[in-house]
Amino acid sequence: MRNIIVKKLDVEPIEERPTEIVERKGLGHPDSICDGIAESVSRALCKMYMEKFGTILHHNTDQVELVGGHAYPKFGGGVMVSPIYILLSGRATMEILDKEKNEVIKLPVGTTAVKAAKEYLKKVLRNVDVDKDVIIDCRIGQGSMDLVDVFERQKNEVPLANDTSFGVGYAPLSTTERLVLETERFLNSDELKNEIPAVGEDIKVMGLREGKKITLTIAMAVVDRYVKNIEEYKEVIEKVRKKVEDLAKKIADGYEVEIHINTADDYERESVYLTVTGTSAEMGDDGSVGRGNRVNGLITPFRPMSMEAASGKNPVNHVGKIYNILANLIANDIAKLEGVKECYVRILSQIGKPINEPKALDIEIITEDSYDIKDIEPKAKEIANKWLDNIMEVQKMIVEGKVTTF
């Protein structure tokens, strides 16, 4: 029998607390660029391994570093003078022994990784010439033999945990969390870019809620070629402000929402957040995997969080990735139950044990006033057991890109 613990949590729900802080680093932020590349490389390797061998081989590509380039932005269009440098690191199965033929088969790990990284950058950074403005250096090496052995022992079985680690998830998102998340997603949507192409991809949204007032502070790169002067820059800022105000009315009805964009700008000196490429990575701002958003897309100091860098870790047995995603999936389903205000889930693994048999799966529930936790407990356990029984579905969701890791 699995060790699933369900208990009532006697604390104020997040919406009833006096303050709340929420952050999201957008797709063009250097840290998020690294997260996105790491995950894209992992998915590409999964597909390559599956095509060649019908199974996913050992890999972890969660070590991506970005070193900022050098640019000279100016109204009407500036220039990149030094490229952005991206290091792909980590470990992967680069060769296997064909026992029937008694020969070593070399696998195209490096070329697969570089191709995946380039394709991701071209998709996300609309104003970057990836072939000219970016150097991609692949240094992915062969995996550790003991961890490869854990992989080998689990073929045709439920995978064995590669580490003793934990995952954390909660649901539902608060109004502030949804507003922060959806603001960045909207500003980086095709719809918005087509209407206001000057908006770059490097967007950071910080939300502060004080009672029924939410203050959004948005750092938003503006692409220089689309603005001829400071007046056109101001117009872009005001257009975006109006768009975010309209979005806030839909998401945060009943709240006073105050919006600040690029608060470090000095219009008199014409010192503003102007970029050539739409990302601060062009000008010395560096990035790493795992320094930004958690798997639910947010940084939430008022909620439980794991410090695990999920992006790029293998989706087969790396519990640091799987359990964080799984915890959120379980929490979301439990939060839909009648009588549940909030749900918090923590899952602990034990290295070498099947990942569908965690050492502990802890569920904390804030209930509606008239509901007893004893009535909710069996349903919550049923949901947790169902997800654990179908844990291989989580692997599939990750490989197909159906769940986010940042």
Swiss-Prot record:
Protein name: S-adenosylmethionine synthase
Keyword Calcium: no
Organism phylogeny: Archaea, Methanobacteriati, Methanobacteriota, Methanomada group, Methanococci
Family named by the database record: Belongs to the AdoMet synthase 2 family.
InterPro entries xrefs: AdoMet_synthase_2_family, AdoMet_synthase_3, S-AdoMet_synthetase_arc
Keywords: ATP-binding, Magnesium, Nucleotide-binding, One-carbon metabolism, Transferase
Residues that, per the record, bind ATP: G141, Q142, G143, S144, M145, D146
Superkingdom assignment: Archaea
Recorded catalytic activity of this chain's protein: L-methionine + ATP + H2O = S-adenosyl-L-methionine + phosphate + diphosphate
Subunit field text: Homodimer.
EC supergroup of this enzyme: transferase
Cofactor annotation: Mg(2+)
Enzyme Commission no: 2.5.1.6
GO molecular function, one term: magnesium ion binding
Pathway: Amino-acid biosynthesis; S-adenosyl-L-methionine biosynthesis; S-adenosyl-L-methionine from L-methionine: step 1/1
Entry-linked PANTHER family: S-ADENOSYLMETHIONINE SYNTHASE
Short name of one Pfam family: AdoMet_Synthase
NCBIfam families according to UniProt: PRK04439.1-3, PRK04439.1-5
One GO term (biological process): one-carbon metabolic process
Role, per record: Catalyzes the formation of S-adenosylmethionine from methionine and ATP.
